[in-house]
A protein has these predicted regions:
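Start-of-domain marker
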Residues: 17-105, 115, 119
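C-terminal motif of bacterial Sec signal peptides marking the signal peptidase cleavage site
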Residues: 12-13
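Signature of long, low-cysteine stretches enriched in small and polar/charged residues
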Residues: 19, 69-113, 219-274, 284-287
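N-terminal "mature-domain start" segment
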Residues: 26, 41, 144-173
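Secretory pathway targeting signatures of secreted, lumenal, and periplasmic proteins
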Residues: 17-19, 25, 32-38, 166-221, ...
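Sec-dependent signal peptide recognition
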Residues: 1-7
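Surface-exposed amphipathic alpha-helical segments
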Residues: 118-138, 163, 169, 274-297
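Surface-exposed, polar helix/loop patches in the mature regions of secreted/periplasmic/lumenal proteins
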Residues: 90-146
Length: 297
């Protein structure tokens, strides 16, 4: 009995030492910078906004990649320590990163400050890329829990790509040539479309051909209420291309609707597979929609 009591005491002591971390707070599009006020104002602030605060390409209004929040070390306590995204910048500390440091679902990056703008820009761009990749991964994992698995399997068979179809979308067309799904609730001023199609490239300028093919899909399937109205790529703002991704704006020809779109392309068996996400949400900021398209397409 004496040994049993001693064993239970040791077991209890071990259990008491285990800390259960709280869930992380804040949103994925925010980053808290923990930097002393003088260092922030004189040397870090401008670089932080030139990296994390840069506007998302392909939108009519400025929406930053991340919302930047700064606090000094003495203010960094309580709920701020449980935020999802934290960057700590100090002098004479080793650079490191740690997941779930003070909360589950958290990433904390610590940077050693170097009195060199170019080095700081390089470091913060690397950190930003990590947070962007992490955000897309988290969004994709979250959406995949309730996405339309049967439909995704068919798209995989037809086009040989892995895309996600969120549960709220209604399938309009599903053939070997074209997949089309839409989200258009009656009581919300919000419309989303997803397209997947492929073609054999023939033009010398592939980027132009991708946009022309996409424009023809818009003109054929996305029609307005009046005769002759259809969606088209906005000519006044040239789409931005980078790493198989196109970001641009669409408008309703002969109407007043418009918004952003995102295209991703893949080279599969001598064909170009095109995935498109398009959003109309005049009353909302567009960042969350674009990030979701990045995650699912």
């Amino acid at each position: 009995m004496r040994y049993l009591i001693a064993y239970l005491f040791v077991l209890s002591a071990c259990s008491d030492g285990i800390k259960t971390l709280p869930s992380s707070t804040g949103i994925l599009s925010e980053v808290i910078f923990v930097v002393e006020d003088m260092l922030w104002e004189n040397q870090v602030k401008d670089v932080a906004f030139r990296t994390f605060g840069v506007p998302i390409l392909g939108l009519t209004q400025d929406e930053s990649s991340f919302r930047v929040i700064q606090v000094n070390h003495s203010e960094f306590k309580s709920i701020l320590k449980t935020h999802k995204n934290i960057v700590i910048i100090s002098k004479n500390v080793p650079t490191s990163n740690q997941q779930n440091k003070w909360a589950n679902g958290q990433l904390v990056v610590q940077l050693e400050f170097k009195d060199d703008d170019n080095e700081l820009i390089k470091d913060l761009n690397k950190v930003k890329a990590i947070f962007e990749f992490r955000e897309i991964k988290i969004l994709r994992n979250s959406i995949s829990k309730s996405s339309q698995k049967t439909q995704e399997k068919l798209i995989k068979e037809q086009f040989n790509i892995e895309t996600l179809i969120p549960s709220e979308y209604t399938i309009i067309k599903d053939t070997v040539a074209l997949f089309w799904a839409t989200y258009n609730p009656e009581k919300q001023e919000e419309i989303k479309h997803l397209f997947v199609f492929s073609f054999e490239p023939k033009a010398i300028n592939l980027q132009q051909e991708v946009l022309q093919k996409t424009d023809s899909i818009f003109a054929k399937y996305l029609l307005g209420a009046k005769h002759g109205q259809h969606v088209k790529i906005e000519d006044m703002f040239s789409p931005v291309y980078s790493e198989n991704t196109y970001r641009g704006l669409w408008k309703l020809n002969g109407g007043f609707m418009g918004g952003p779109f995102l295209i991703k392309t893949y080279f599969i068996d001598k064909k170009v597979v095109v995935t498109v996400g398009l959003i109309f949400a005049p009353n909302n900021r567009k960042r969350k929609y674009i990030k979701t398209f990045e995650a699912i397409l």
